[in-house]
Amino acid sequence: WTLVGGGVFDRAQTERSTASVMPKGSKWQKSAVAAFEPERNALVLEDGERLHYRTLVVAPGIKLNWKAVDGLLDTLGRNGVTSNYKFDLAPYTWELVQNLRGGRALFTQPPMPIKCAGA
């Protein structure tokens, strides 16, 4: 939520359900994939079900590992520690930016090729 953390949008303007942005006629399969079989135009779900496709779009997403940084969970969302990767914290980022009058602000991002170059 870079644009929320940067004060461009209010958080409420950026929230939508996933179902509301699914293209009409598409099927949303809410299951984990265990294996791909491109030679058969198929994939196998974790429960063993095999799905065949003509066109496949895979959106694996990302899993954030907040516990990987010692002490982060203890202070995230207060003490000047925030993240634009967390929907409820992006407004706090903007609050911190607005109130910064001196000192240093540290911004980090994961290595490319992408999560979100600006977040």
Stretch-by-stretch model annotation:
Residues 1-53, 119:
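N-terminal Rossmann-like dinucleotide/flavin-binding domain of flavoprotein oxidoreductases
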Residues 51-63:
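Short hydrophobic core segments
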Residues 64-119:
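Rossmann-like dinucleotide/flavin-binding elements
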